[in-house]
Amino acid sequence: MPEVIPKPKRAYRKTSETQQIIFDTAMTLMSEKGFQGTTVREICAAACIPVGTFYNCYKSKVDILRRIYDEGDAYICGSISREAEGLDAIGQLRLFSEYYARLNEQTGIEVLRVLFYPSNEWFSMNRPMQVFIRKVVDSGQRGGAIRSDLSADGIIDCLFDILRGICYNWCVCNGAFDLSIRIKAHMDLFCAAITT
């Protein structure tokens, strides 16, 4: 009896390639029409795939955005944890902001424009990035480096208001300023405001 060669790797490769085609097509359409203005049918038509194939790769259009956030969380949390060792809380916040700026620069203006839509649930979720920052702020408050008269939640909200606001403005201004430099300047002000 001849040996049967399994095909999962090839099927996986096809699925992975199809997911990437769908993702790239969706990002292009969403950059032009926005998240809300782009339908799954339009994505499938532009990618030349059946609608069923889309749903084999993604549960919904929202899953495409989830991929961006998951990759961002993995990048920041995976990279920063090694470098953050030995830094005080303020140093860790500054390091986080550098990685956040770098991530958004790498993500690019077109994709960021897709992410900034009013009902984006991930802006209010307790993502790994926010969990990391929560640990930094809690540690900084316990150690006396960060003001304790402000709530940790308030500090974290303020930090993400600043970071997201700068990224949003970067998109509106079509990348007319250096994102990393702008974030660093605002982080200097933010850190001065929360330091004891």
Can you annotate each of these PLM segments?
Residues 1-6, 86, 102, 131, ...:
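C-terminal peripheral helix-coil segments that are non-catalytic and often amphipathic
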Residues 47-58:
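Short hydrophobic/aromatic patch on the recognition helix
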Residues 58, 64-72:
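Alpha-helical DNA-contacting segments of helix-turn-helix folds
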Residues 1-33, 41-46, 63:
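Basic, helix-initiating cap at the start of DNA-binding domains
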Residues 74-77, 119-145, 153-161, 168:
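Amphipathic alpha-helical packing segments from all-alpha helical-bundle domains
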Residues 67, 78-106, 156-159:
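Hydrophobic alpha-helical connector segments
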Residues 112-120:
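Short linear capping/connector segments at secondary-structure termini
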Residues 36, 146-147:
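Conserved hydrophobic residue
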